[in-house]
Amino acid sequence: MPREIPSPVAGAATLEETVDAIAAGFDPRVEESVEAAAVHLARLANNRTFLGDLLLDQLRDAHRTELGAGGYGPQAIVLSPVVGGCFLRANIWPGERDKCLRASGATSLVYGIAHDHNFDFLTAGYFGPGYRSDYYEIEYGDIAGYRGETVALRFVERSALHRGRM
């Protein structure tokens, strides 16, 4: 279940500074380390030009030849190699009225498909109104785990990851 982390961090960082800072000793099992990584991520999110500049550079340099190399969908951009068991990526979630979503369809971008993340992650809203998510809880002990199994879901909330939210 997500938790909101206050991110009133001043100053901005480059992608390289963020990758280096997190690689210097991030341990997701230690709360203080997660909090420190959140500060670094918030500073990167305060850098209002890095992502647009990176995308333009990658398009100019024909980066699209590596599309899919990260094992993610078309909206994911891998920002760093795996270092210390973690990496940085950016996701672009088109709005309902965006041409690419209308052309490709919502399911091609995994919209409206329930899923359970089997890993923890920090995420920060960077641009736009933010993607909306519905959050549910389940009783893992009640699940056998076979394909097609009906699972009881308990609705928790709907929220949006807007700019400045972490």
Report each predicted region and the residues it spans.
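Short beta-strand segments in beta-sandwich/barrel cores
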Residues: 129-133
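Conserved short histidine dyad/triad with adjacent acidic residue
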Residues: 59-63, 90-117
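A short, N-terminal "cap"/entry segment at the start of jelly-roll beta-barrel domains
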Residues: 4-96
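Short acidic-glycine-tyrosine-enriched beta hairpin
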Residues: 117, 123, 139-166
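Short, acidic, Ser/Thr-enriched surface-loop or helix-capping motifs
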Residues: 126
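Catalytic micro-motifs at enzyme active sites that drive phosphoryl/nucleotidyl and oxygen chemistry
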Residues: 76-79, 108-122, 155-157
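Glycine-rich, histidine-containing beta strand-loop boundary motifs that form or position
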Residues: 135-137
